[in-house]
A protein has these predicted regions:
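Membrane-interfacial and juxtamembrane segments of integral membrane proteins
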Residues: 1-135
Length: 135
């Protein structure tokens, strides 16, 4: 595996996803009526931008690629890999339950990353993607 194809660790992936959720929260607060839907769209499509990088991944220098070919993540792959977080995000509008569901989805996903020899979470398994570090 070349330097460019080094798998990203849990800490870097968590930092990138946290930055993405901060961006989503800012959009939700700034544009209340459509902010939720804009946030959902970004959550689902974000990894398809910038050659396989959401804004959070771009800042942390991570990239989502196909597990087999190492080609950048497509919008289709992004939707598939982030559908698990999107399912939790949809419950966000339900007081308390939304927070709990999103928290449980996040814990499940990050636990799977730790338990996977390839560092793949459920969303990665569904989409056939991995997250790598870049220069």
């Amino acid at each position: 595996m070349s330097e460019e194809q080094r798998r990203a660790g849990l800490l870097l992936r968590t930092a990138a996803k946290t930055l993405d959720f901060i961006l989503i929260a800012a959009v939700m607060e700034m544009v209340p009526r459509v902010g939720f839907y804009a946030g959902l769209a970004y959550l689902l499509l974000g990894d398809g931008f910038f050659d396989g990088r959401s804004l959070g991944k771009k800042l942390i220098k991570l990239k989502v690629v196909s597990a087999n070919t190492y080609t950048p993540c497509t919008f289709r792959d992004s939707i598939l890999r982030n559908s698990t977080f999107a399912a939790g995000y949809i419950f966000w509008l339900v007081p308390w339950i939304g927070w709990i569901v999103l928290f449980l989805v996040s814990v499940l996903e990050f636990t799977l990353v730790l338990g996977s020899k390839d560092g793949m979470r459920l969303g990665d398994e569904i989409a056939g993607t991995v997250v790598i570090e870049t220069q």
